[in-house]
Amino acid sequence: MAVPFLSSSLQLTPTSPILFTKVTPTPIIHNHRSTCTIPTKPRLRLLRRSAVAGTAVSDQTEGGGDVLLNPEEEKRVEVADYDWTEEWYPLYLTKNVPEDAPLGLTVYDRQIVLYKDGEGTLRCYEDRCPHRLAKLSEGQLIDGRLECLYHGWQFEGEGKCVKIPQLPASAKIPKAACVKTYEVKDSQGVVWVWMSTKTPPNPEKLPWFENFARPGFFDISTTHELPYDHSILLENLMDPAHVPISHDRTDFTAKREDAQPLVFEVTERSNRGFAGTWGREKEGGKGSNLLRFDAPCVLQNNREFEGKDGVKNYFSGLFLCRPTGQGKSMLIVRFGVTKRSPLVSVLPQWFWHQNACKVFEQDMGFLSSQNEVLMKEKVPTKDLYLNLKSSDTWVAEYRKWMDKVGHGMPYHFGHRTISLPKVPPVVEHAPAGLIAALSASYPAKGGIGTMHAPNLANRYFRHIIHCRSCSNVIKSFELWKNILSATAVALTALAILVVSRQWKAVLLGSAALCSAAAYTCLRAINLNTNNFIRTHRRL
């Protein structure tokens, strides 16, 4: 899902070159005639590859070879050294990290807890108390220490246990009573985590975005938790072709009559990602929009444009996608520009936040069902997708990149290869059962009543709980709704008691205005918490 007002103005900024890593000789190639992954020896790889190629080309090029991306352009699958833990992953917007409570998060299936200590320093631990495995994210902060609320064990700094209430006064705290720590960095308003506990953090891999460091650069940033895999999410974000159709009239830049062939040019490929330009065929196919994907999950869409005053301006659409387990992902979206539109200044930020939620909801059904098919079919995307040259170039590039490095991930679906998860999604998310999983998830923290049960299809749990500004706005609207409703009732009662017709009219008119204002607050609350429902129409 590329957000509509982004898709027509995407471009790339120069970054440091991406270095190739050593290539290993044993890829895993999937034979599309079966439903299993086949590890092949280097000597047999080309033979097996040829068998697959012959069928795929004859099937997919018949009646469409001039418009379909050729799935057999490469003679072999190139495999690169890769370890998913030796990467920086985006955790949260710094401004939204709670000051007074720990925050439970995940990267793939690894559960971690993030909090601020007494000095405001960010700390990240494994979300598991060494005592009896209770979630530390369900704990509390006391004097800058993270306390497990099960038995009161307290931890600080580099995971050291500093208090065990049940321990005799003369006894020393065991050295084993410590928690595993992860390195975190606050960079350009985003908290990043280094997932490896064996390899020291590599500062050169920490993303840096040139546009966001420019003087006067203004951005609107939102966080969204989504019910589909991060690879599906990335595919959607790098797909400008769907925007005029799926997001028709969501804002003034998305119109279905503008759907047209697109022209793509790949300008860079490496083991760390790819980059290129794209443009609309009707505009001569000029690549004024630039896209860059950097491992493991960073997508940039940038554009440079000149204003009427001759000053060069910069626009960025930045998507930071964190895998949070099978069929789940979390996305930080950041739209920024050096020249702010007057409309952005007039409308409140919560309006843009709910509009972003609406865009994700428009695509949610498509992407969730796509995720379901991939999990059921258990074959590479080349056996399922019909990628067009004029719309799907970035999607094919991304899946081919997965072919190179997917062996170093917990699981992957590449263009030609797959590696399936070790455990089924249901077992990963609910090993002790659905109710136990709900009780142990954020923000339920033990409570699974209708008010607190997490539901990733619901806008409140996808965005509001992760956004401090929207949470505060809803609380304010709720407060004013109650005040105005009570005032309207009081004015109506007073109007009944007074004798003067003139005062009755004034009081009833005031009550009507208060009721209208209370209704407006209710509508604003609904706008921020209720999902968009697509209304189909005959065209």
UniProtKB/Swiss-Prot annotation:
Supply the InterPro entries for this chain: Cholesterol_7-desaturase, PaO, Rieske_2Fe-2S, Rieske_2Fe-2S_sf
| Gene Ontology BP terms | protein targeting to chloroplast; protein transport
Gene Ontology CC: chloroplast; chloroplast envelope; chloroplast inner membrane; vacuole
CC cofactor note? Binds 1 [2Fe-2S] cluster per subunit.
GO molecular function: any one? chlorophyllide a oxygenase activity
**Segments crossing the lipid bilayer:** 483-500, 505-527
Q: Where does Fe cation bind?
A: 242, 247
Looking at the record, the residues that make up the Rieske domain are 88-193
Please report, in chain numbering, the residue ranges of the motif Redox-active motif. Answer: 467-470
Tissue distribution of the protein: Highly expressed in green tissues and very low levels in non-photosynthetic tissues such as roots and etiolated seedlings.
Protein name as annotated: Protein TIC 55, chloroplastic
Protein source organism? Arabidopsis thaliana
